[in-house]
């Protein structure tokens, strides 16, 4: 009696497990995804003992495991369905036989065996899950490799373009870096050159400052000397007579009385009446003045003498060359006359052979005189001979004029050289006489004027490019009333030398 209700209860439990609607599953699988494989208890008796009639649903799968278990959900469910169907069949068969043969102990043994089978299946399931996870990872790697292998040509072209742009940018960056380095080197060189220039300018400025200091000191010394000289001047004026003082005050700084004369007058200790200088001082001053004048005249005479010697040498050389050329021309003319005479002698011999000399010998003295006198027929030949002679004379005159012009140019060159030497010596003398002029401010101007006259050369003002103009300038030199040297030079050579 007890076995019958037990079988009915087991059938109810099996019906409850087979029917999804009994446990509230409306087709969604109790919150599970369709096709999923989840753990389901196989033994109905253990289910009843642990949970009773209401069995709790299995836990939901985790998110990381959802995707890994999807491929095996269907196979797991299929395996469990097979096992559950076999269990159901066995239970039904056992339920039919349990009423007669099986007991509780046998059922327990079978349940224990079923649990062992479930554990074995669990271990196999775990191994298969691990294999599936490895295969899924391999599939992921293969998918990523396939995605990389299936990269489009557009991405490849873009990659090539980016690589080319990168190379071009690297080249531009290298060029810009080289330019920057070059500019830096150039700027460094420019900076060094400017630093050197600034240093040079500083050195030059220092030297110029030192020179300026020296010049300022010299100017101060000169001013002090000028003050001393002014004081001496006033003292010398005080020592002179009233008339001489008036003359010195009325006239300009350059007077006939030189500083040397004033020094001589002031050096004399014997004074005349009224503080005037004595006669011996005046005589010494006048003699000193005469000595200076004579020295200056002597120098001018020496210069004029040297210039006369130079001009004489130049003209002598020119005249010797002219005479040599004239002698050569005379020799050529003599040779021509000899040739003409030989030709006439040969013609006469030919005429004698032809019988002309008999008629010529028969000419009387009157015929010979008529032949000598010019006639109308012979006037043309004579005119031709005269024209030839005039042309020859004109050519000779032109040659002489050119030779004289060359001689004059040589003379002018000598004179210019001499004038330059005189200017150099005069400049050196002026440099030497600067302190003397400061110590004696009342030096007369006639010495400077004579030096200027000595340096003046009227030949320099004449143009030497045209020979005839040079000859005219020699014949009629310009006269300067202030300079006696030009008069001596104009009279140094006679006018007959130019026309022989």
Swiss-Prot record:
Annotated region Disordered: the residues are: 1-105
Record keyword S-adenosyl-L-methionine present? no
Top-rank lineage group of the source organism: Eukaryota
Entry-linked InterPro entries: CCDC125 (IPR034608)
Coiled coil stretches, renumbered: 101-237, 286-314
Compartments, as annotated in UniProt? Cytoplasm
Residue stretches of biased makeup (Acidic residues):
10-23
Q: Which GO terms describe its cellular component?
A: cytoplasm
Q: Which UniProt keywords apply?
A: Coiled coil, Cytoplasm, Phosphoprotein
Phosphoserine: which positions carry it? 492
Instruction: Tell me the tissue specificity.
Output: Expressed in many tissues, with highest levels in spleen, thymus and bone marrow.
The answer to keyword Ribonucleoprotein applying to this record is: no
Q: What does this protein do?
A: May be involved in the regulation of cell migration.
**UniProt protein name:** Coiled-coil domain-containing protein 125
Its source organism is Mus musculus (Mouse)
The taxonomy runs: Eukaryota, Metazoa, Chordata, Craniata, Vertebrata
